[in-house]
Amino acid sequence: MCSSDLDYAAGGVSYPAVTYDAGGVRYIVMFDAQSGLPVRIRTLDFDNMWGDVNYDLVLAEWQPLAGTRVAVSQRYELNGRVVADIRLTQITPNPQVNPAGMTVPDALRATAARPATGNVPYQWVIRRQFIGTYLDSENPSFDTLATQSLRLQELAPGVQHVVGGSHNAMVVDMQDHLIVFDAPVSDAQSNWTIRAAQARYGAKPVRYIVLTHHHMDHAGGLRAYMAQGATLVVGRGATAHYRRVLAAPATRNPDMGAYDFSKVNIIEVSDRYTMTDGSRQGSAHFTENPHVDGMLIGYVADARIGFVTDIWSPGAAPLPKEISTPLAAVVTAARRAGISPLRFAGGHGGTAEYAPLAGLAGAK
C-alpha cells in the first residue's frame, strides 16, 4: 500500500513524502521539493535504549551514473543522532560477475530459512554491520544456527550464568529475591532470564538489576526488570543517562508493554554497594578502566565469583603474555575493593580462574 500527498518534518524542514508498506514495515520517503530526489527514508522503529525512534537513511550529493543518479553520501540517523556516515568513493555500474560465485549450494538452499515475518530486527542487524559484527539471525540475542537457546549454567549453589547468546548475565539467588548482573540485548532476553530464574528458584522478584555499564548491548533489556519493580544499580555519573532512557516513550517495544518508569529507584555507585539478605552478600564495585566511564564489576562473596563485562571476557581466549590496560583494571579493582575472587564470569565468553590474571598483573 502506498500513500502520497503527505508532509513530514525532519531537522526543522518540511518535506513532501510518500509512505508505503512492505514486509510488515512502513517506509516514509521524503523528497526534495525542487529536485524531486529522495532525501530521507524513515522507519518508525524501537531502540532498546531510546525507545520509540525515527530511524533514517539520509541521502545527499546525488551524482549521475550510467543514466541514473546515485547518492554518494548515505548517513544513518537515530532520532537525529548519526550512527553511521557512509561515502561512496568508487562505483562501477553493471560490473562483470562470475555467475558461479553467485550460485547458492544445493545443501544450503535446502536448509535455508523462510523469509522472516512479523517483528524483524533489521535495525539491530544493520547497526551490527556498521561495527563489523554481522549476526545472520532473526533472533537478535543469538544465532539460531549456532546455538539452540539461552541457558542457565550453574557456577555455584544459587549462582547462575546466563549463556548461549552473544551477551551474558549472572543471576544470584537470595532468600526472598534475586539479583541480576547486566540486562543485555533486549527485553525478550531479560524476560527469558526472569522466567528461567524463577523456574529454578521459585517466584522471587528481581530486587536489584546491576548494570556494569551503559552500552546498549549490555543494558538494552533493562525495562523488563524495571517493570518488576527492581532497583537499578549503576556506576558513578550514570543516573541522568538512565533517567533519560527510562523517560523515553516505548510504545513500539515488541517484547513488553509501555510503563511509567518515572519513579524507578536508581542507586549510583561511586565506590561499593552491598546487597544482602542477612546471609548471602552480593556487591557492585566502581572500576576505573579504559573502556567506559562508570564501570562496575560484580561479586558474590560466599561463592567468591566475580562478574565482569568487556574489559575481560573470561574463557574467551588465553591470557596474553603481557598484561593489557583493560585486564590490569580488573585486578586493580579487585585489590581496591578488597575482594578475593576465585573465578570471574563474563558478560562475554564464559568463566575463568582469577589467579592467573592476578599473577600476570603482578609479574609486570
Predicted regions located by residue number:
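Short, small-residue-biased leader/transition segments that mark boundaries at the very start
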Residues: 2-3
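Gly/Pro-enriched, hydrophobic low-complexity segments
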Residues: 11-109, 299-301, 308-309, 314, ...
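Zn-dependent metallo-beta-lactamase
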Residues: 86-175, 273
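Conserved beta-strand hairpin/beta-sheet module of binuclear metal-dependent hydrolase folds
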Residues: 152-199, 295-314
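Active-site metal-binding loops of divalent metal-dependent hydrolases
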Residues: 183-185, 214, 230, 237-238, ...
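Active-site metal-binding motif and surrounding structural segment of the metallo-beta-lactamase
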Residues: 188-233, 336-341
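Metallo-beta-lactamase
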Residues: 237-287
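Divalent-metal (often Zn2+) His-rich catalytic cores of metallo-beta-lactamase-fold enzymes
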Residues: 330-364
